[in-house]
Amino acid sequence: MSPQTETKASVGFKAGVKEYKLTYYTPEYETKDTDILAAFRVTPQPGVPPEEAGAAVAAESSTGTWTAVWTDGLTSLDRYKGRCYHIEPVPGEENQYIAYVAYPLDLFEEGSVTNMFTSIVGNVFGFKALRALRLEDLRVPPAYIKTFQGPPHGIQVERDKLNKYGRPLLGCTIKPKLGLSAKNYGRAVYECLRGGLDFTKDDENVNSQPFMRWRDRFCFCAEALFKAQAETGEIKGHYLNATAGTCEEMIKRAVFARELGVPIVMHDYLTGGFTANTSLAHYCRDNGLLLHIHRAMHAVIDRQKNHGMHFRVLAKGLRMSGGDHIHAGTVVGKLEGERDITLGFVDLLRDDFIEKDRSRGIYFTQDWVSLPGVIPVASGGIHVWHMPALTEIFGDDSVLQFGGGTLGHPWGNAPGAVANRVALEACVKARNEGRDLAAEGNEIIREASKWSPELAAACEVWKEIRFNFEAMDKLDKEKDL
């Protein structure tokens, strides 16, 4: 923004426009332990210096506006303003920079992810001086983390509730996602659960449509999982989607699920909103319900490399808002996810303390100060041949969710579930014996299929299926000349 002649007002106020960098670019600033730190990928318009672009981001996401205002004199800008304290060029990209911004903690309401994102990723993303802007990462200080409840229960409490240890959990999204009657839907749930799955799932699209109202679905699914529990002796769950058009209706559905005695409900946290999600998470903790989170709409926000917000930031926001599971990509399936980047935000979901590691896209060290962890869910285009890779990549604290990879079995839902359970148990056994899942995965599956006709049939159906597309979300590297 070009400087403009300042006009001196009669009370000593200097009106006019001045460059943002004069106030908001402070390379000498030493960050505080209580600051929220943000790493923005900034693409300035031609002719806009990177320092001015970074300062504009700091200003417009904190105390600044396009012109000086006389009310600036009524507060302490030095106390409340955001500061761009460091800028570095992005390797391999022309006119693209990482701008680091520090925000004083007093700018944010305690316990409100909604308020945090309203400030940091608000109007600044439409700022004309920038061609594009992407929030790559946040460092949320312990002082702010401690104002959040976080996940309703967390990983260890969920395992204790389910009495399941030492392996990933298995799930399945019921298909077709739309169009089934409630009774037929419940039948599909029962077949999958009795075949050996731990969970089945409402699709994110399923709320309360004319072909299947929510109350009918809840009742038939509860009947299905209780019947499967009685037959198998294992605790079962179905993610009943409580997402609704109002927060009041959402809570009403969660209350009904609790009255049915089911263990888990579900929410679409981005389309539903962080305020609704946090309210539901609080209800779930108070009433003993696990909370599964779907990330529908995330790719609208995080898919583009130079604009929007990286999923690792959305994942941090979810852990603060509250959820016991969240979909996190597969690395090997049909949906977006490069291995190093995916494992970076998987660790941010599960672990208590994560060191800065730019090789995995982690810009800041993050201390969660004992906030419960979130189980990542691998879902989308996966089948039995992927089981060794998924077990090796995600480890035990994960949910491996096979929708078409269960319901597409040539013999039906229950045999599809059997095939997945046998494949998983074979991979866990092989891993515990010291075998290399990455190198011997196909052999492990073939060996297991000799003793399971259901697995053998699944192996035959999906032996040629591949999703060989290059990931859009990749680490920054110098380009070859």
From Swiss-Prot:
HAMAP family in the record: RuBisCO_L_type1
BP-aspect Gene Ontology terms: photorespiration; reductive pentose-phosphate cycle
Site positions (Transition state stabilizer): 334
Pfam families cross-referenced by the UniProt entry: RuBisCO_large (PF00016), RuBisCO_large_N (PF02788)
Signal peptide range: none
Entry EC number(s): 4.1.1.39
Subunit structure, interactors included: Heterohexadecamer of 8 large chains and 8 small chains; disulfide-linked. The disulfide link is formed within the large subunit homodimers.
Subcellular location: Plastid, Chloroplast
Catalytic reactions on record: 2 (2R)-3-phosphoglycerate + 2 H(+) = D-ribulose 1,5-bisphosphate + CO2 + H2O; D-ribulose 1,5-bisphosphate + O2 = 2-phosphoglycolate + (2R)-3-phosphoglycerate + 2 H(+)
The keyword Acetylation is annotated on this UniProt entry: yes
Residues of the propeptide: 1-2
Lineage: Eukaryota, Viridiplantae, Streptophyta, Embryophyta, Tracheophyta
Cofactor(s) the protein requires to work: Mg(2+)
Residue positions, PTM N6-carboxylysine: 201
Cofactor note: Binds 1 Mg(2+) ion per subunit.
Species of provenance: Coffea arabica
Protein name: Ribulose bisphosphate carboxylase large chain
List of residues that carry N6,N6,N6-trimethyllysine: 14
InterPro entries, per the entry: RuBisCO, RuBisCo_large_chain_AS, RuBisCO_lsu_C, RuBisCO_lsu_C_sf, RuBisCO_lsu_fd_N, RuBisCO_lsu_N_sf, RuBisCO_lsuI
Family: Belongs to the RuBisCO large chain family. Type I subfamily.
